[in-house]
Regions:
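Eukaryotic scaffold repeat domains enriched in small/polar residues
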Residues: 1-249
Length: 249
């Protein structure tokens, strides 16, 4: 793979999908890291950035090259791009999550997280605080949305009805780009510039950090995303080193 930018874990099939933006392709791997196959939509993908699998088996792919949320029918090898709109305004999709049968996207222009229906139409909007900075990532864990503010270095959370909780301030990170939340409620923050994973408690208290910037076995070089798989392992998309690293406790 050239430059991996995102990882999707298919818990049901126990497969790992890596989004290669520069190579304009999706790569699938088994749980042991064995390469399975690649998908390019017959060369039509344009700068894919994120992806997820729907209940019907089709894939949703964020294509930044055409600003679309593209539905991919693997069986019929058909890709259908869709430019999302909310109240007549074009949505610039960044990150994508599917949880509990619901589709969520991050609109990088408005800074909102949007919930979509089966027809990929906006049905709910989660608005960040008025003084929010720049949202870099979000995850949906147990019906709760967790969003990472890169500029203010804060974590926002919302329940499924959109009710917010007080923001959680993070200290000791330089350039947070992604977050993951474990079953104990700890935050795993990926610092792109430092090449490190920094762990915080539920209230934002610093716990520890691991990995450093570099191109060796125990290094990260401009990493892009972090998430937990169905086995509780922490997966880190290490863009600069063209790999995905998997850690277990």
């Amino acid at each position: 793979m050239a430059l991996p930018v995102a990882l999707y874990v298919d818990n049901e099939k126990e497969r790992y999908y890596v989004v290669d933006s520069t190579g304009n392709k999706l790569l699938s791997f088994a749980g042991d890291g064995k390469f399975l196959q690649e998908f390019t939509a017959e060369g039509s993908l344009q700068k894919p950035y994120d992806m997820a699998r729907l209940a019907d088996g089709s894939l949703l792919v964020v294509e930044k090259g055409r600003n679309s949320l593209t539905r991919v029918d693997l069986k019929n090898k058909k890709a259908t791009p869709l430019v999302l709109k909310q109240q007549g305004r074009e949505v610039f999709v960044d990150r994508l999550e599917v949880a509990g049968g619901k589709v969520y996207v991050l609109d990088r222009l408005s800074g909102r997280i949007l919930q979509l229906d089966e027809a990929l139409q906006v049905v709910k909007s989660f608005t960040m605080p008025a003084d929010a900075g720049w949202l870099a990532d979000f995850k949906v864990v147990e019906k709760k949305i967790w969003a990472l503010d890169q500029k203010k270095k804060q974590v926002y959370s919302y329940d499924e009805n959109g009710r917010p909780s007080p923001p959680i301030q993070l200290t000791g990170v330089d350039f947070p780009v992604s977050l993951a939340v474990d079953q104990a409620g700890l935050f795993y923050i990926l610092d792109r510039h430092r090449g490190a994973v920094v762990v915080f408690g539920r209230n934002g208290e610093f716990k520890y950090q691991f990995l450093t910037k570099g191109q060796g076995r125990d290094n990260l070089y401009f990493p892009q995303e972090v998430r937990f798989d169905h086995l509780g392992r922490l997966c880190v998309v290490d863009e600069g080193n063209s790999r995905v690293m998997v850690f277990k406790r």
